[in-house]
Every structure is written in structure tokens, then in C-alpha cells.
Amino acid sequence: MMQESGSEAKSNGSTIQNGSSGGNHLLECGTLRDTRSNGEAPAVDLGAADLAHVQQQQQQALQVARQLLLQQQQQQQQQQQQQQQQQQQQQQQQQQQQQQQQQQQQQQQVSGLKSPKRNDKQPALQVPVSVAMMTPQVITPQQMQQILQQQVLSPQQLQVLLQQQQALMLQQQQLQEFYKKQQEQLQLQLLQQQHAGKQPKEQQQQQVATQQLAFQQQLLQMQQLQQQHLLSLQRQGLLTIQPGQPALPLQPLAQGMIPTELQQLWKEVTSAHTAEETTGSNHSSLDLTSTCVSSSAPSKTSLIMNPHASTNGQLSVHTPKRESLSHEEHPHSHPLYGHGVCKWPGCEAVCDDFPAFLKHLNSEHALDDRSTAQCRVQMQVVQQLELQLAKDKERLQAMMTHLHVKSTEPKAAPQPLNLVSSVTLSKSASEASPQSLPHTPTTPTAPLTPVTQGPSVITTTSMHTVGPIRRRYSDKYNVPISSADIAQNQEFYKNAEVRPPFTYASLIRQAILESPEKQLTLNEIYNWFTRMFAYFRRNAATWKNAVRHNLSLHKCFVRVENVKGAVWTVDEVEFQKRRPQKISGNPSLIKNMQSGHAYCTPLNAALQASMAENSIPLYTTASMGNPTLGSLASAIREELNGAMEHTNSNESDSSPGRSPMQAVHPIHVKEEPLDPEEAEGPLSLVTTANHSPDFDHDRDYEDEPVNEDME
């Protein structure tokens, strides 16, 4: 029994020793074995407590092991993150080093171009030379076709371009020869200095620097000459700059072309234009680009080529030679540049000098949608003005036909006498064929004498002194206005400083009709003018005075007092009455108009003299070629007025075939200046006569005092 208990104690001790983690368990097992060996009975309670204690210690040991494993994993992750960060830093450092190397290389290149190395050991000295100057670009046939498609050049322009290209190539050859000579001289001087070795290095470097400066100055002069040449080409319309070609002004258009190729190109274009020359010869005065293109259907390319063709509605016909001469005489004159401001419609950009204006013109007004739209609007304005000019010419021709054709029957309602003429009759033309129109404008050469051969121009019966008849330019040539006319070009008038081709009365009526209540105050009318037209945003004192004048002058504008104050409305019936009217009355009031020499000579002379006094270019002394017109200006009026009195005194001496005049009153011819708003229109000679009460409806056009209504 003792042996069995000892074996059990040994087995228990082994299990306890394997499961325990401290030396206390061995001591306890030893004491248990000793007690059992002494013959004591085993205590079951002590064994269960020991087992529970051992299990707790095992669990604690497992938790400690798990914590150690977690700490090791976290340390490994941190090490990996640190390694990744180090790798990223290394990559960033490498990139920075590469960027620094690139910057250093660029700086070396720039410094090499600006200041070449001055090394005595070099066999030859490197001098910076412009690549565009020394190596001309060769234009391929495809580029030639593109140039021909983009720009249709006339034979004259091609000839000028050919001459300028030849001169440019000669300059390039001279520059190359000069460069070679300079390089040889520098090499010889360097060799001499190396062999001699007497001069110090500082003096050698100074000499080389002075030679380089001289050479660079000559290169700059050549580049300036080329730029001036390109600017002249741009002014003449031979060279256009596309938006995507910023480097084009530094090189000529046909640089590098062989003269033979240019001659062949010129021959081809001239052969293509020969057919158009025959058709365009009859319409050369209406050609916008002074080329051989017919005026009936001008192409868009011709309008784009020559920017001087139409500027703000004014046509200018110039040949390339005259244009180049004008640019040489006035290098800073341009139709789109004046007083330091860009005159492009709607631009008004301030440019300090002419090169800045050219830079602004090439950058801001390039060939794009906005510029083409503005060009189309300008073309519409020009077309409207041309139509109006054609109508006025037809009226003038009809008036001249009526005045110079001999009439046998009295006219019931002739046109009002508006003496605006640009054609005069000579003595031979008026006597030989009185019924034919004059073909060439001539000046009267016969001395001015009192009228003795025929009666007066206008004879009246029972005319009473009632008041003067006034025919205003705005009433005679009143341009009708509609909302469609303004809406069509609304954006153009808002942005471009262009005078609208309408009278002030029509504009005031349009402003009132556009209002919701069909009535506006004076300030609201002003605001409408400035809002709709950019032209009225300046010189407010002038046009506001004209608006007030028109409001008080015309009876179609009615002033109404209401809660707001004084408002203006439109009477459509009165407005339609003030449209152009013809003199209606008794046919016996107006006699026949004779076209004899005695009538034509003083009448035309008075007309020319009055036009010369008012500084109209067609009738100035220089253009007429007659220096006596200016000196006889004042005498002609008195002579014309005296002629009427002279014919009145010689009534009894008239021929039997002519009826004597009845109650002749002198007709005084005086000049009536237009209103301030009509200063741009032509001046008219207005006849002031005594008339009957039948003409009372024309008194609406009298000038009334202007009411200064400041509301």
C-alpha cells in the first residue's frame, strides 16, 4: 500500500511539474509526497485548489504570450511604414535633383547665348546669330497653295512683294558675307594674340567684347530693318497674321523663296486675273480693294485682305503704290488709329504709341467670329449709306434735269427749289442743247452780268407778306425708322460709336413708342438715347440740346402734365403730316422755268460761290480751279438779288413773245445752317420769298425758341 501511494504521488508530482510555471508547485508536491510517505491519508481538497490555481496561471501565461505577439506585429508594421517613407523621400530627392539639373542646363544654354565663352584655347570664337536671319525657311508647294488660298493677291501687289523679297535676300547675303568676314578677322586676331602673348588677358577680352558688341549692334539693325519691312507689308494688306501664328511678324511671308518661283507665281496669277480685268475695268471706281475683282460681286477674301477698304462706312480706293507712299510720308497714320485710341467699332482701347496699336490690332482684332461679325455689321451700315446716297443722286439728277430742260407748259406741282448741285453748265452747252444733260462738270467762264434776256425764275401773282418758307434737311430727307431697323443692329449701336442714320425726331418717337405707357419724361428720353446708342454717351450737351429743340419744334410731340410731372407723347397724325410734302396750290403761282444762258450763269455761279464759302470740298477754290470764285462770293448774291430788280425795271422793254411780269418781288437767297444734330449733312440753299396763305401748312417747319426743359 505504501508503494502504491508513493507511485501515485510520483505521477501527481510529474503532472504538477509539467503544468506549473513556478518553483512553489514543486515544493508543495514535495511536502505532499513527504506527508504521504509518512503514512498520512491524502487530502482531496488541497488537490482541487492546486489544479484551479494552475489553470489560472496557465491562462495568464497565454495572455502574456498573445500580448508579446501583438507587440511584435505592430513593430514590424511600423518598420515597414518607415521604410516606405524613406523610399518616397529618396524619390522626391531624386526628382528635385533632376529638376535642378534641368534648370542648370537651361541657365547654361541661356548664358551661352547671351554671353559666349571667352576662352583663349578655343580655335574659333562663337558669335550668336539669329537662326531666322542666317537660315531662310524654304516654303513647300503645299504652303504655297495655302498662302494662295488664304490671300488672293493682285498682280501689282505680287510685283511689289517680289521687289521687296529680292531686296531682302540681298540684305541677307550681305549679312552672311559680313558675318564670315567678321569671324575670319576674329580668328586672325586670336591667333596673333596667342603667338605674341605680350598683351595681358584683360586687354584681349576687352577688344573681343567691343568687337562682339559692334557685331551684335549690326545684327540688331538688320532685324529692325526686317521688322519695318514687315510692318509696311501689314499696312499695305500684303501680310495677314493668323491668331495661332505669334511668330509670324518676325519673318517675312515669302522668306526663302527663289526669285524665279516668285516670278512664275506672279505670271500664273496675272494670267488668272486677265479675264477679271476686262469685266472689272468698267467698275473700277466701286472696287473696294483696288484690284481687278469686279464690283458687282466682291469676294470676302478681298475685304479681309485690305483692311483699309471700308472703315466706319467710308470707302477709300487706293492703289498699293499710293498707299505705300502715304505710309512712308506718315508712318503712324492708320484709319483705325487716331489720337492714341483704337478706332475699331466698339473697341476704343488706349494705345500709347503706334507699335502698341499694331500689337493690339493683331492680338485683339484677329480673324475670329467676333471680328467677322463686326465686319458684317459695318458692311450693312455701308450698304445702307450707299443706298441712301444712290437715292439722293437720283433726286439730284431729276432736279438738274428739271432745271435745265426747257419747258413749254406750266408745271402743276414742281419740286421745291433745293439748290444743291454738283454739275454746272457752260455757255456753249446751255445754248447748243438745252434739252440734253451735261456730261462733264464745267465752270462758267463768262463774266457775270445782270439778267436782261429773260424773266425771273419764279414769278408770283398777288403774293402777300406772310412769312418765310423753310425747308430743313431733316424734313426733306427724313429717313423712316422702325423697331426692326434698330433691333437688327442693336448690339452694334450699343457698342460702336457710330452715328445712327436716323433723325432726332424719329429716334424720340421710337423711344416714346417703346415705353409701356407710350409717354416719357425728358430724362427718360435721355436715358433711352444713352442706353441704345454708344454715340450719345459723349458730347451730352450738344445732342441733349438738339433733343430739347426737336421736342419744342415739332407739333407731333405733345407735352402733358401728370403726377410725375411733364411727360411727352406722340401725335401720330401730326407726325405723318411732317413727312416730306410737295407744294400744292394754284398752278398760276409758279411760272415756267427758263434754262437760258442768262439764268444758268448767275444761278450756278451763286451756287458755286456759296458752296465755296461753306468749305464744301467739291466747290472749294482749289478744286474748282477758278481763283475768282472766292473773291466774288459776296458780290454774287447782291448781283443775283439785283438782277431781279433789274428785270422788274425793264418790264416794258421785254420782247413781244414774252409776257410781262406782274408784281415781282425780289427773291433773296440766303444760307440756312442746319441744326446742331444735322451738322454732318450737306448745307442747302433755301429761297426765302413772300407767299400766299396757301403755304401756311409749311410754317410748321419754322424754328421756334428752344424751351430748356430740365426735368
Curated annotation (Swiss-Prot):
* Chain intervals with Low complexity compositional bias: 438-452
Q: What UniProt keywords are attached to this protein's entry?
A: DNA-binding, Isopeptide bond, Metal-binding, Nucleus, Phosphoprotein, Repressor, Transcription, Transcription regulation, Ubl conjugation, Zinc, Zinc-finger
Q: What is this protein called?
A: Forkhead box protein P1
Q: Which parts of this protein are zinc fingers (C2H2-type)? A: 340-365
Pfam families xref list = Forkhead (PF00250), FOXP-CC (PF16159)
Q: Give positions of region: Disordered.
A: 1-41, 273-292, 305-332, 424-456, 645-711
Q: Which organism is it from?
A: Rattus norvegicus
Top-rank taxon of the source lineage equals: Eukaryota
Q: What is its main location?
A: nucleus
Q: Where is this region: Leucine-zipper?
A: 382-403
The UniProt regions of compositional bias labelled Acidic residues, in chain numbering, are: 701-711
Q: What biological processes does GO assign it?
A: cardiac muscle cell differentiation; cellular response to tumor necrosis factor; DNA damage response; endothelial cell activation; forebrain development; heart development; immunoglobulin V(D)J recombination; innate vocalization behavior
Q: What is known of its domains?
A: The leucine-zipper is required for dimerization and transcriptional repression.
Tell me the residues on which Phosphothreonine occurs.
687
Q: Entry's SUPFAM superfamilies?
A: Winged helix' DNA-binding domain (SSF46785)
Which segments carry the region annotation CTBP1-binding? 416-420
List modified residues, type Phosphoserine.
115, 692
Please describe what this protein does: Transcriptional repressor. Can act with CTBP1 to synergistically repress transcription but CTPBP1 is not essential. Plays an important role in the specification and differentiation of lung epithelium. Acts cooperatively with FOXP4 to regulate lung secretory epithelial cell fate and regeneration by restricting the goblet cell lineage program; the function may involve regulation of AGR2. Essential transcriptional regulator of B-cell development. Involved in regulation of cardiac muscle cell proliferation. Involved in the columnar organization of spinal motor neurons.
One of the entry's Gene Ontology molecular-function terms is: DNA binding
Summarize which parts of the chain are annotated to bind DNA, as ranges: 499-589
Q: Where is the composition biased (Basic and acidic residues)?
A: 320-332
Q: Name one GO cellular component term.
A: nucleus
Ranges of compositional bias, category Polar residues: 1-19, 305-317, 424-437, 646-657
Organism taxonomic ancestry: Eukaryota, Metazoa, Chordata, Craniata, Vertebrata
Q: Where is this cross-link: Glycyl lysine isopeptide (Lys-Gly) (interchain with G-Cter in SUMO2)?
A: 321, 406, 411, 476
Where located?
A: Nucleus
